[in-house]
Amino acid sequence: MAVSMQVDIVSAEGSLFSGKADMVFAQAADGEVGILPKHTQLLTQLKPGQVRVVSGDEEDSFFINSGVLEVQPSVVTILADTAIRAEDLDQAAAEEAKRRAEDAMEQAKSDTDIARAQIELAEAVAQIQTITKLRDRLHKTGLS
């Protein structure tokens, strides 16, 4: 029998995913991490980006704006501020959010305004990247 792990993705809105998986990929603060069953314990902050949950030939993709990844030997838990299934992301809205954040950065008058605009820009860019990666994966598998 194949070894798998329990994966739970939870946001303030509720549980988005709960199930068994063979591998999880997430955007940690220091770069992408790949988690396999029996991984050493880990607690790390997540930055805006894609989370992929792989089980056999199936792959579920999510966007999170920030959160925490906790890894136990047989359980991976992602606690996200906001989590959205990648297929539910709206590219036009993400592009508009990116444009607004860029405008806000140009018009920022304080360090706080700049920091807020940078966060908004990072989230919008991460959403666009998640959409692009999902589209590319679907195209490669002939599902687009």
From Swiss-Prot:
The record ties this protein, via InterPro entries, to: ATP_F1_dsu/esu_C_sf, ATP_synth_F1_dsu/esu, ATP_synth_F1_dsu/esu_N, ATP_synth_F1_esu_C, ATPsynth_dsu/esu_N
Q: Which molecular-function annotations from GO does this UniProt entry contain?
A: ATP binding; proton-transporting ATP synthase activity, rotational mechanism
Q: Which Gene3D superfamilies match?
A: ATP synthase delta/epsilon subunit, C-terminal domain, F0F1 ATP synthase delta/epsilon subunit, N-terminal
Query: Which topology term describes how it sits in the membrane?
Result: Peripheral membrane protein
Pfam families in alphabetical order: ATP-synt_DE, ATP-synt_DE_N
| GO terms under cellular component | plasma membrane; proton-transporting ATP synthase complex
Alphabetized, the UniProt keywords read:
ATP synthesis, Cell inner membrane, Cell membrane, CF(1), Hydrogen ion transport, Ion transport, Membrane, Transport
Its subunit composition reads: F-type ATPases have 2 components, CF(1) - the catalytic core - and CF(0) - the membrane proton channel. CF(1) has five subunits: alpha(3), beta(3), gamma(1), delta(1), epsilon(1). CF(0) has three main subunits: a, b and c.
Q: Which HAMAP family match?
A: ATP_synth_epsil_bac
Which protein family is named in the record? Belongs to the ATPase epsilon chain family.
State the protein's name: ATP synthase epsilon chain
Source organism of the structure? Hydrogenovibrio crunogenus (strain DSM 25203 / XCL-2)
What phylogenetic lineage does the species belong to?
Answer: Bacteria, Pseudomonadati, Pseudomonadota, Gammaproteobacteria, Thiotrichales
Question: Which gene carries the instructions for this protein?
Answer: atpC
